[in-house]
Amino acid sequence: MHFLIPAAGSGSRMKAGKNKLLIDLEGESLIYWTLKSVFSASSTNWVGIIGQPKDKELLLNSAKNFAHKVHWINGGDTRQESVFNGLKALPKDAEKVLIHDGARCLINPELIDQCANQLDQNEAVILATKVTDTIKIVDNEGFIKETPDRNYLWAAQTPQGFLVDRLKKAHTMAIDKNWKVTDDASLFEMLNWKVKIIEGTYSNIKITSPIDLKIAKLFVKNSTPS
């Protein structure tokens, strides 16, 4: 399975002053823990990191001790542009791809394999969890407009998996139509193409704030042999 990791997080909400994937987590960078999980999945055979040139040396340095090579791909101005760059950099024989947020360093390798396997029956899959909170839709003035039925609400995660040719086509059409999205599954939705949900875990958080980092430290401590 070919695997792309967008890794251009600025770390502004973390107040880190650097790419948040370079922040220390129990003696290693965030991207190290993400790569550790990715390479622990039996389906993984090719990995590309998509990032900004200024971070290339440090990000690849975090990958140097893994047995598998990590390929570098220059990112764009947005996540959407970066993923499209990643797709164009895949080997010509790549038929399927998983795309995973670099900041989701707690991903279970078994879920990665599950996503990969489901691409044998589906052209697009994403990990997601059932929403447990009551969600409110509000107007521009902060007043509640409605409460959607949470039985139909899922919180999207990554990896998100796709047939490569299909996703390339979706990105090309998005450029033509000037569509802006924050994840690749949204492109499929806009084109009325089916995306299969695979139930994920609540521990697969995206590290975006200092409290997220504290949670991640607890998980890493409990999963790392002393």
Curated annotation (Swiss-Prot):
PROSITE patterns the UniProt entry points to? ISPD
Per the record, the pathway is: Isoprenoid biosynthesis; isopentenyl diphosphate biosynthesis via DXP pathway; isopentenyl diphosphate from 1-deoxy-D-xylulose 5-phosphate: step 2/6
UniProt-listed GO biological process terms: isopentenyl diphosphate biosynthetic process, methylerythritol 4-phosphate pathway
Site (Transition state stabilizer) location in chain: 13, 20
Which is a Pfam family this sequence falls into? IspD
List its EC numbers. Answer: 2.7.7.60
Give the reaction(s) catalysed: 2-C-methyl-D-erythritol 4-phosphate + CTP + H(+) = 4-CDP-2-C-methyl-D-erythritol + diphosphate
Q: What class of enzyme is it?
A: transferase
List keywords of the entry alphabetically. Isoprene biosynthesis, Nucleotidyltransferase, Transferase
Picking any one GO molecular function of the record gives: 2-C-methyl-D-erythritol 4-phosphate cytidylyltransferase activity
Residues the record marks as site: Positions MEP for the nucleophilic attack: 150, 206
- Family assignment? Belongs to the IspD/TarI cytidylyltransferase family. IspD subfamily.
Please give the function described in this protein's UniProt entry: Catalyzes the formation of 4-diphosphocytidyl-2-C-methyl-D-erythritol from CTP and 2-C-methyl-D-erythritol 4-phosphate (MEP).
| Alphabetical list of HAMAP family matching this protein | IspD (MF_00108)
Q: Which NCBIfam families match?
A: ispD
Name of the protein? 2-C-methyl-D-erythritol 4-phosphate cytidylyltransferase
Q: Which organism is it from?
A: Prochlorococcus marinus (strain MIT 9312)
Gene that produces this protein: ispD
